[in-house]
A protein has these predicted regions:
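Positively charged n-region of N-terminal signal peptides that target proteins for export
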Residues: 1-4
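N-terminal post-signal-peptidase region of extra-cytosolic proteins
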Residues: 25-29, 94-100, 119-124
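Generic short beta-strand
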Residues: 137-139
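Short, surface-exposed coil-to-beta transition loops
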Residues: 131-135
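Mid-length scaffold segments of soluble, non-membrane domains
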Residues: 105-120, 126-130
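N-terminal segment of the mature soluble domain
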Residues: 38-40, 47-114, 146, 150, ...
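C-terminal/domain-edge helix-coil "capping" segments
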Residues: 18-39, 106, 141-228
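C-terminal motif of bacterial Sec signal peptides marking the signal peptidase cleavage site
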Residues: 13-16
């Protein structure tokens, strides 16, 4: 049976032990609580820096639901992708340099969310195996271009097979389990966990009430600076 380990940049105990900075949501993301707070978020298809070509597709089908669940209106990512394709934009890295006001004018979005997939890996070493997904999230205001929310999330699933007492059988079982792991629930959980650190939006009954919740902030401010 699979043993699942979640490694997230949340949780007071873990953050305290590792020295990660602890803040409330209001302290970390004040723009999400004042007049600049977004109601609608345009999600850009992920920038894929991993070695898995299919990673963006897994992201596209798992991002909208958890974002909607915390109170934000959003458009399906596949529709957004098709719109940009018709404009000749085939890579999301091309979108990062655009003025954010374009997203307000053309989509009516209050904020735009960029996600970078850093890792989407299967690792298999002798009798041990695991699958790791790691993503960075940066949300910008479409009016001011300022970063109003940012976060990172990593999830690792241990795919090591339980010992049967036969090394060859265990080796084969671990290899098969690692190779056939379903990425969709992994991606969905990573997105869900990231949005636990996102202040609730205007369509949630928790809107404006979660400012005192503690979170750890670990995402690099350079998340949008990799292209200069």
């Amino acid at each position: 049976m699979k043993k699942i380990f979640y490694i997230f940049a949340v949780g007071y105990f873990v953050a305290s032990c590792s020295g990660l900075p602890i803040q409330t949501k209001l302290e970390a993301y004040p723009a999400m609580y004042d007049d600049r707070k977004p109601l609608s978020v345009l999600v850009i298809p992920a920038i894929n820096n991993s070695t898995a070509a299919e990673a963006t597709d897994y992201f596209n089908v798992t991002i909208t639901e958890p974002l909607s669940n915390v109170g934000y209106y959003t458009m399906p990512v596949e529709i957004v992708k098709d719109i940009f394709l018709k404009e000749g934009i085939v890579d999301s890295s091309m979108i990062k340099g655009l003025p954010t006001t374009i997203f307000k004018k053309n989509f009516g979005a209050d904020a735009v969310l960029f996600v970078t997939i850093n890792k989407w890996d299967k690792q298999y070493i002798v009798l041990a195996g695991n699958v790791t997904v790691s993503m960075d999230y940066v949300m910008l205001s479409t009016e001011t271009s300022e970063i109003i929310w940012q976060y990172s999330a990593t999830q690792t699933i241990d795919t090591t097979a339980e010992s049967s007492g036969f090394i060859i059988a265990d080796l084969i079982s671990t290899a098969i389990t690692t190779a056939t792991t379903d990425y969709v629930p992994i991606a969905k959980q990573a997105n869900f966990q990231a949005f636990t650190a996102l202040p609730h939006g205007g369509y949630s009954d928790q809107h404006g009430l979660d400012g005192n919740q503690s979170i750890s902030t670990t995402l690099k401010d350079a998340a949008l600076d990799d292209e200069g």
